[in-house]
Amino acid sequence: MKIERIEAIPYSIPYARPLKFASGEVTSAEHVLVRIYTDTGICGVADTPPRPYTYGETQDSIVSVVTKVFAPQLIGLDPLDRSKVQQLLRRTVNNPTAKGALDIALWDVIGISLGTPVHKLLGGFTDSMRVSHMLGFKPAAELLEEALRFRETYGINTFKLKTGRRPLSLDVEACHVLREGLGTDTEIYLDANRGWTANEAMEVLRRTEGLGLSMLEEPCDAGEALGRRRLVQHSSIPIVGDESVPTLGDVSRELLSGGSNAICIKTARSGFTEAQQILGLCEGLGVDVTMGNQIDTQVGSLATVTFGAAFEASSRRAGELSNYLDMTDDLLAEPLKIHDGAIRVREVPGVGAAIDADKLQRYRQDRA
């Protein structure tokens, strides 16, 4: 079996409303669908979410690097030669989500060729993941209303509150209102997307002490090394690295330097192969992980479920899997369903991300 052709298809699907957080705002999913074809007729699929304000990638740059840089190197290789593929991808610096999509699409090819679900090939620990829902920048009362609605409609009982606003009282108030309205049995954690300084983050933790918050993700820029380390040392809850740890090397640096003591894994930027390496490092060091969301479509969310459910350590916490609900449509032929607060893996060969051809034709951006 050889790689015969690689496609990178730009497409755009609007969000029902703008998604706002400390590092930016998005109004539509300007993503790239990656498809890898083999000479045996197999097609592997993955989704690529550009995040220019986080990783420097754009829709155009992803299409270009996939088709002009990676495809010429990968065509003719056996998809099962995974280490050789990784060595070729590493030759080109940066471009994490382009590399991640190629890796996931190749795992999809391998699963289909072997007639086995990829979550089984990876580890097969469980068949579902609990879902965490992200709450964006809104007045506190509206945040509580949304959380209660998602708990009632989908059974979700874990919420990630986007923070990093000024004045700090906006986020402090939101934390208190959510805890009072949701009760003590609901998990709430924070993600500041580098919106605060280390001192501001410490102040927020002081003013929310006793609310039972479970984690604080990317409170400040990891470049504030001393402030970040001081925050980790004095915080009673884990400080999670996310944007600061896109690669295995970054994870090693942040953990060993004391800049983070928990790690967010995002398959969109690491693929399944590097995500496994990151998970193994964290397990060896006794560090908790969360499965994050790159504002993923259903295609991307299914990839996260596939990886997260494969291992005990990655399935302990609820994964960030509901962002696709903010989209007006999706490319997945068989939509994901959240039932009793969880999403199940697909018990089919590969990842199971069959694409609706009509919808792809409607939303693709590379044809007039």
Q: Residue ranges of each PLM-predicted region?
A:
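Shared catalytic-loop signature of beta/alpha-barrel
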Residues: F70, G212, G223-V240, V245-A342, ...
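Metal- or metallocofactor-binding catalytic centers and their adjacent structured scaffolds
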Residues: R5, Y37-S113
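Metal-dependent enolase-superfamily TIM-barrel catalytic cores that perform enediolate-based chemistry
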Residues: L122-S235
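Structured beta-strand/loop patches that form or line metal/cofactor-binding pockets in enzymes
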Residues: M1-V45, P49-Y55, D326-D329
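A cross-domain feature marking catalytic cores of carbohydrate-active enzymes
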Residues: T48, H133-L135, L161-T163, L190-R194, ...
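Extended hydrophobic packing segments that form well-structured cores
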Residues: V351-A368
